[in-house]
From Swiss-Prot:
It holds the Pfam family MMR_HSR1. Belongs to the TRAFAC class TrmE-Era-EngA-EngB-Septin-like GTPase superfamily. EngA (Der) GTPase family. InterPro entries: G_ENGA, GTP-bd, GTPase_Der, KH_dom-like, KH_dom-like_a/b, P-loop_NTPase, Small_GTP-bd. Keywords: GTP-binding, Nucleotide-binding, Repeat, Ribosome biogenesis. One of its GO terms (biological process) is ribosome biogenesis. This is GTPase Der. GO terms for molecular function: GTP binding; ribosome binding. HAMAP family: GTPase_Der (MF_00195). It comes from Brevibacillus brevis (strain 47 / JCM 6285 / NBRC 100599). It comes from the Bacteria.
Amino acid sequence: MGLPVVAIVGRPNVGKSTIFNRLIGERVAIVEDMPGVTRDRLYGKGEWLTHTFHVIDTGGIEFGETDEILTQMRYQAELAIDEADVIIMIADSRTGVTDADVELSRMLNRTGKPVVLAVNKADNPEMRADIYDFYSLGLGEPFPVSGSHGLGLGDMLEEVCQHFPAEDDEEKRDDVIRVSIIGRPNVGKSSLTNAILGEERVIVSEVAGTTRDAIDTPFERDDQSYVLVDTAGMRKRGKVYETTEKYSVMRAMRSIEDSDVVLVVINGEEGIIEQDKKIAGYAHEAGRGVIIIVNKWDAIEKDDKTMQRFTELIREEFKYLDYAPILYVSAKSKQRVHTILPKVNEVAQAHSMRIPTAVLNDLVTDATIRTPPPSDRGKRLKINYATQATVKPPTFILFVNDPELMHFSYERYIENKIREAFVFEGTPVRIWTRKKT
């Protein structure tokens, strides 16, 4: 089932994006400054007390050229119906209840999903007290908030979290590998999903999200349990969704966040385009295990150098995914589909690998002897010791005399030495420097 999804809807200019940015906090920042690794201000992850959830700013999606407010709101409501466990409707305390608010509240009431009404721009006590008219919308208690000042959001989130579906015990099992299949439209995600599941003799069940359309599909193969994340996301949508690039990116981002290993699917017939790089960049930035799948490989004319040339192209276009294995398959003919799950197992194992501290420090010491650390104005970097902080992805901390002396190239050198000594295929390796205390 993955993390709960909260959709923010409302008519234009009520402050949806301001509240969205408040909820996701610093996660909107771009982690790495390299091509293909960007973050749209459309979708993010929020936290409140012990709860973590996805947030969708439906106002960030433009469906067509129409300026008709009601049409735009209807699209927002449809998106919320498809995606959300809980819907936050934003209204404006300064304008009061409008006809558009009334119409939107009726749409949302028909979804049958929990709706929390937030009355924004209630920036002072008088405005916070004067919201009783909003009870007329029939959405229960209105919560006065100020997105610009951060006021009232705690009470609103407390109500939102009350409606989250209970977490399935199956979701918590460490031995289950969660896999998502992502890519732009028409690369063959649905066919690949069916090809993978079609090879399985034991499909345990289809577990539907309690209040949303997304379906995770558990299955087993050779005594290993898997969950294919959000297979409902592969279904054909209406034209408005199929033609909306941002929608497919948002869908991919949510699947990535809920996964251990991500299969990035490329259409071998069409080659690589900018949207491929954007979607793959999200998988890298999220720190998930990554396998690049070139689909429809049976449909192109080949010579003995074709695969080599395509591999070189992938390595050039996806420089930040140089650790990701590449598989050439055909979902339609099932060619090499049998190689996918064994590779998923290898990547998942690497993604959760721990290196003993003593072994890690021996490796780092040897690396610094072979290539001494850099110096700046007579002061040389000294790595005192190293430790592995976390897994998924493997993250290492180097305690040093002065973090400012650590150059990116030397950090990459240490990463390469770690990769040479241990099999970290398919997983990013994070290295952080801290000042030794």
